Amino acid sequence: MEKPGGFWIPKKSNKESSWEELAFAEDDAAGSLWPPRSYTCSFCRREFKSAQALGGHMNVHRRDRARLKQADDQYLFPKSSSSPEYPSHKDSDNIHETSCYTLVFNTKPNYFKTQHSCVIDLSSSSSLPYLTPSRVSSGLPGKQHTSSSPPSFVVEPSKNSKYIPSSSPWSCPSTVVEQKSCDLYEIPAMEGEKKRKTESDVPKIGHKAKLSLGNTTDLSVSMNLVIHQSFPITAHGSDEEIGRVDIRKRRRRHESPSQQSIFISSLSCKSDIITRNEESKHKGDRFEDLDLELRLGTDPPKGI
């Protein structure tokens, strides 16, 4: 064979060719199959002609195995602690609730065991008509209730209405709740004349509580609504919760005089405004009488 340059290239014989060339030549001639052209799946023993097809088929098997594993995990662990549950509101012997909800009267006081206190800020207009869980923060367990105690709510003043004493706005524990119980006490500081009202002001019949705020809209800046809610105490956190209860009681004792002073100051400001309005009205009446007498030509009174 001669190339355009004039060089001779000897032709290789079959013996001098490489083993790879010989193998592919035999494959083309329908001889021995090398390299193998059939790929078998190890799971279903299905044969494929190319490695790419086998790889896609193996991806299907991987997805199926992942789904089976996920189904097994859900069967072993059906409930996860991260997802919150909502109440069914059914009258049965075992009532399961796992978070804070709207204020509901208790129809079965025998379920009272222990209670948590939740604080709702009344200064914001969004939390007044609807007591949503986003404005509720859990407190600590307090005193126990007897079976004869009626359901009620607690309204008490706070030192700073913008501050809600909790670590997170939705921190109610996701444990089993038996029932909800509350006590209503209204603490307006009317210059030391009125005392705390008992729970007789709360209606004892009904499923949902209707809060009659009355004339407390001016005082809502420095008031918080405290809802006592029953939760069973867990065994691992009993000592820590008891210590927190003592600290919270001490803080309330220290904060009570300052809270009353805030109410007194707000009421005194309101009374000053009323007296000023009365004085200005009285002076206006005097000037009207003087103007009328000047028009008629009579002498003005000497007292003015």
From Swiss-Prot:
GO biological process terms on file: regulation of DNA-templated transcription
Zn finger region (C2H2-type): 39-61
Coiled coil: none
Taxonomy, superkingdom: Eukaryota
SUPFAM superfamilies in the record: beta-beta-alpha zinc fingers
Ribonucleoprotein found in the keyword field: no
SMART domains named in the record: ZnF_C2H2 (SM00355)
Compositional bias per record (Low complexity), positions renumbered to this chain: 147-157
UniProt entry tagged with the keyword Transcription: yes
Locations listed in the record: Nucleus
GO cellular component: nucleus
Chain segments carrying region Disordered: 71-91, 135-157
PROSITE patterns documented for this protein: ZINC_FINGER_C2H2_1 (PS00028), ZINC_FINGER_C2H2_2 (PS50157)
Keyword field: Developmental protein, Growth regulation, Metal-binding, Nucleus, Transcription, Transcription regulation, Zinc, Zinc-finger
Gene3D superfamilies referenced in this protein's UniProt entry, alphabetically: Classic Zinc Finger
Pfam families named in the record: zf-C2H2_6
GO molecular-function term, one example from the UniProt record: DNA-binding transcription factor activity
Tissue expression notes: Expressed in roots, stems, axillary buds and flowers.
Miscellaneous comment as given in the Swiss-Prot or TrEMBL entry: Plants over-expressing ZFP10 show are dwarf, have abnormal leaf morphology, flower early and are sterile.
Function: Probable transcription factor that may regulate cell division and growth.
Protein name in UniProt: Zinc finger protein 10
Native source organism of the sequence: Arabidopsis thaliana (Mouse-ear cress)
